[in-house]
C-alpha cells in the first residue's frame, strides 16, 4: 500500500494501526536462482509479523551499504550528522526528510544489492563481520554453540536461595562470557537437570516447531507437547503442517473473537516426575528470539505434588494458584482442562510473585479488576508502598512495540493507564497524576543500527509509520535502550518491563516483567464511560512486590550479574538507570521505512520491502 503524508510517500508493507504484532499467513517462497544463503527460504517457515518477515529477508539477502550517492535521490538536501540517522518525526521544517523512497526506485526493480566497499567511516568490526561466513552458516554455528549451552555454569547454583526473585535473562551470543554466566538458554530450561519431563505445554505467539523440538533433550523429544496458539485460517493450517510429523504434538487454538487481538502470552508448563514448574517469559519459540536479544524469564520453584491425606490447598500468599487456574479457564478450551487438573494436584505455596494476565473480552463490574491494567491497579492498591511524603516516584515502561494510543496523551496513556501504574496502598499521600514523570524506554534508530544483529533487529520492534505519524506527541517520552549493567546494550530488547523507582533510581516500589507491550490491545481500554474494560489479546506477566518478600521496597542491584556481596533483596533490573532521554537527533525505530545513510554492524542498509 502506498501512503503519502507530510513526510513523503512510502510503500507500506502492513498496517500497524491497531496492534503491534498481527499474525500473517506464511506462504512458501517461490524465488529461484542463486541467493545469498541459497537453500534458505526468503520468508520464515513460521507465522510472524510483516516486520519479522522483512528482517528475515534482509538477513538472507542483505542490501550492502555504499557511501556514494548512487542510492540516494538526486535532490539538494541538508545533510545531518550521523546522530540524525533515521526517520524524522518532528514537525520542524528544517529537519531532514528521509533519503530514499520506494517511489524513486525504477518501477519493478528492487534496490540493488551492492557489493560492500569499506569506507573510512566503517569500523574494523564491520569489516571483520563482512568477511565472516554467510548468515545461514552463522546460524548453524550458533545453534551448535548452544548444544552445550549450560556447560560451565552450575544450574543448581542459579536456582538456589541466593536468587529469591528467580528472574533471569536469556543467553546472548556475541557478548562477554561473564554476562551469560547466570543467564539461561531454552535448552537449559528444558534440561534434565530441571526435572525428568513427563509432558509440557508451550503457550506462545510464534512457533518454529522443528527448532523447538531440537531444544528438548533427545530423551524428552517424544514426550507429549501441547502448543497453545492464536493462529487462524492459513496460519493455523501452516502450524498444523509444521506439527504433523510429530505424533506427540497436539495443538490448542486460543479464541480471539475481538479484531486485531493476538495470543501473545509466553509460558511453559513443565510436568516432571518430581513435580511441576511454571515458566513465564518474553521469547517467541523461534531461534532468533533466543540468540541476540534481551529477553526475560521467571522460573517458578519446583512445585511438589500434593499427596492424599495432605490437607493443604497448595495456595500461596499471592494467590498464584487460583489466578493461574482462572487464566487457563478463560481460554474455555478442553485441552487445557488436563493442565488445570495438574495444577490443582500440586503445591504452589512457595510462589512469591503475583500473576497479571490479559484475556480477550469486555469486562464490567468486579470482572474489570481481573485482567489488564485494572488487574495491576488492584494489586498495587492492595500491596504497593506509598512514596515518602514529599517524594515523587516516577514510573518506567520498557517495551518492544507500540500500538495506536490515540490523538493525545489524555486519551489513554496519561489517563487510565498511568492511573493504574500510580496506584498505591494509601491514596491520600500521592502527588497528582500529571506531576509524576513517565519514562518510556524504546530503542532508537541508532540503538538498532549498532546492535549485534544490525538493522534486522528492528524486525522485532514492529512500530509502524502509520501509527507513529499519528502520535508524535508520544515521542518526547522516549528514552534510549542502554544495558551496560547486564552487558546487553547491543542486544535489542524483546523483554517488556514496567516499574516504579525512587526519584534517585536506587529503590523500587514494584517491578513487572510481562509479554504486554505498550498497547490498548494488550492492557485494555475503558469503554461506556469507564464502565467496561475491553481487551483484545492474551498476555501474561509476573509482578514482584516488596511485601511478598517481607520488605518495604526493593534496593536496585548495581550490576545485574554481580556477586552475592550485594544484599539478597537487591532487585536485578536488566537495563541502566536512570534512563537516558533521546537526544535531539535520536528517532524511534520504525520498521517499515528505509535507513540508508549509514551501515549497520554487518555493513548493510535497511530496505524493508
UniProtKB/Swiss-Prot annotation:
Main localization of the protein described in the UniProt heading: nucleus
Single GO BP term: DNA repair
Sequence segments annotated as region (Disordered): 1-154
Enzyme class: hydrolase
Residues the record marks as site: Interaction with DNA: 519
Subunit record text: Monomer.
UniProt-recorded name of the protein: Tyrosyl-DNA phosphodiesterase 1
Organism from which the protein derives: Rattus norvegicus (Rat)
Amino acid at each position: 500500500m502506498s501512503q503519502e503524508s507530510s513526510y513523503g510517500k512510502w510503500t507500506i508493507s502492513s498496517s500497524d494501526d491497531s496492534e503491534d504484532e498481527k499474525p500473517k499467513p506464511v506462504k512458501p517462497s517461490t524465488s529461484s536462482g542463486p541467493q545469498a544463503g541459497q537453500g534458505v527460504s526468503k520468508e520464515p517457515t513460521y507465522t510472524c509479523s510483516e516486520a519479522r518477515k522483512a528482517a528475515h529477508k534482509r538477513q538472507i539477502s542483505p542490501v550492502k551499504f555504499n557511501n556514494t550517492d548512487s542510492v540516494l535521490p538526486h535532490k539538494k538536501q541538508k545533510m545531518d550528522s550521523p546522530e540524525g540517522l533515521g526517520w524524522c518525526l518532528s514537525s520542524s521544517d528544517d529537519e531532514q526528510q528521509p533519503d530514499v523512497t520506494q517511489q524513486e526506485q525504477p518501477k519493478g526493480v528492487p534496490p540493488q544489492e551492492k557489493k560492500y566497499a569499506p569506507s573510512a567511516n566503517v569500523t574494523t568490526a564491520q569489516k571483520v563481520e563482512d568477511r565472516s561466513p554467510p548468515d545461514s552458516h552463522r546460524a548453524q554455528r550458533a545453534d551448535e554453540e548452544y548444544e552445550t549451552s549450560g556447560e560451565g555454569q552450575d544450574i543448581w547454583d542459579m536456582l538456589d536461595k541466593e536468587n529469591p526473585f528467580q528472574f533471569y535473562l536469556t543467553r546472548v551470543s556475541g557478548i562477554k562470557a561473564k554476562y551469560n554466566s547466570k543467564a539461561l538458554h531454552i535448552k537449559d530450561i528444558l534440561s534434565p537437570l530441571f526435572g525428568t519431563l513427563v509432558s509440557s505445554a508451550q503457550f506462545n505467539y510464534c512457533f518454529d516447531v522443528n527448532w523447538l523440538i531440537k531444544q528438548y533433550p533427545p530423551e524428552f523429544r517424544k514426550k507429549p507437547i501441547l502448543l497453545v496458539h492464536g493462529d487462524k485460517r492459513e496460519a493455523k493450517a501452516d502450524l498444523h503442517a509444521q506439527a504433523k510429523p510429530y505424533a506427540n504434538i497436539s495443538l490448542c487454538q486460543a479464541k480471539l473473537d475481538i479484531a486485531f487481538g493476538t495470543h501473545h502470552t509466553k509460558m511453559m508448563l513443565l510436568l516432571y516426575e518430581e513435580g511441576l514448574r511454571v515458566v513465564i517469559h518474553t521469547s517467541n519459540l523461534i531461534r532468533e528470539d533466543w540468540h541476540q536479544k534481551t529477553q526475560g524469564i521467571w522460573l517458578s520453584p519446583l512445585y511438589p505434588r500434593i499427596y492424599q491425606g495432605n490437607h493443604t490447598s497448595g495456595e500461596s500468599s499471592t494467590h498464584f494458584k487460583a489466578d493461574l487456574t482462572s487464566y487457563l479457564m478463560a481460554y474455555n478450551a478442553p485441552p487445557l482442562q488436563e493442565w488445570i487438573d495438574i495444577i490443582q494436584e500440586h503445591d504452589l505455596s512457595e510462589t512469591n510473585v503475583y500473576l497479571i494476565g490479559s484475556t480477550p473480552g469486555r469486562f464490567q463490574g468486579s470482572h474489570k479488576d481481573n485482567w489488564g491494567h485494572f488487574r495491576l491497579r488492584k494489586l498495587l492498591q492492595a500491596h504497593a508502598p506509598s512514596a515518602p511524603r514529599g517524594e515523587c516516584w516516577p514510573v518506567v515502561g520498557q517495551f518492544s512495540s507500540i500500538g495506536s494510543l490515540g490523538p493525545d496523551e489524555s486519551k489513554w496513556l496519561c489517563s487510565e493507564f498511568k492511573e493504574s501504574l500510580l496506584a498505591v496502598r494509601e491514596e491520600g499521600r500521592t502527588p497528582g497524576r500529571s506531576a509524576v514523570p513517565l519514562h518510556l524506554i524504546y530503542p532508537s534508530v541508532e540503538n538498532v543500527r549498532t546492535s549485534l544483529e544490525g538493522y534486522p533487529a528492528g524486525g522485532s520492534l514492529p512500530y509502524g509509520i502509520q501509527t507513529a505519524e499519528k502520535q508524535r506527541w508520544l515521542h518526547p517520552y522516549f528514552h534510549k535502550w542502554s544495558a551496560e549493567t547486564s552487558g546487553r546494550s547491543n542486544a535489542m530488547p524483546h523483554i517488556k518491563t514496567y516499574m516504579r523507582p525512587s526519584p534517585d533510581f536506587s529503590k523500587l516500589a514494584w517491578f513487572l516483567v510481562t509479554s504486554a507491550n505498550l498497547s490498548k490491545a494488550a492492557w485494555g481500554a475503558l469503554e461506556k464511560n469507564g464502565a467496561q474494560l475491553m481487551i483484545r489479546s492474551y498476555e501474561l506477566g509476573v509482578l514482584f512486590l516488596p511485601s511478598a518478600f517481607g520488605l518495604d521496597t526493593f534496593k536496585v542491584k548495581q550490576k545485574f550479574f554481580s556477586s552475592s556481596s550485594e544484599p539478597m533483596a537487591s532487585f536485578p533490573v536488566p537495563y541502566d538507570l536512570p534512563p537516558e532521554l533521546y537526544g535531539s537527533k535520536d528517532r524511534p525505530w520504525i520498521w517499515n521505512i528505509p535507513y540508508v545513510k549509514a551501515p549497520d554492524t554487518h555493513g548493510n542498509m535497511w530496505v524493508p520491502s
